[in-house]
Amino acid sequence: MSCKVGFWRQDVAVLCDWEIKARCDKNSMVVPFDPELLNPASLDVLLGNHLMIESIFSPDLIRVDISHYTEEEPYRLEPGEFCLAETVELFNLPNDISCQFVLKSSRARSGLNHLLAGWCDPGWHGSRLTLELKNERVHHAQMLYPGMKIGQMVFHAMSNVPLKSYAETGHYNNHLTVMPNVA
């Protein structure tokens, strides 16, 4: 498809629950797709099994498997600590849909912060979303475990298909786990 330069459609919008479901059912936009995670204008996403954390011994982030942690015995993100995390869900955005990650308000109110790199361009595919998380609390750890609701994705219908899709130009396609900077 090509973009019609100079043509403006008035139907640009955030997708509602039934539109998200239809896209996921038809195009595998989110895998796995659980309709129980639908909200009126977003889809909840879950924390995956891998983190990347800082080490005092190396400037590089170290990959950590947290699959054995549970709600009863969670991973502790200590005060001021930063980590990269991943979603359980794999995303396959068509060329006419973009999306944005937003931290669940309950997580934000507990002092967890997402550091604002949550935009996903049309055509981004075959990848789990990497999250940049920081514990903003001073005295208490944040408890993290696989499968917890961490945020929600808001999907945007594009006014037109872009001239260049992220499928052609993106660095972060086809990444099945948390990814550090590859630019």
Predicted regions, residues:
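DUTPase catalytic domain/fold
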Residues: 1-183
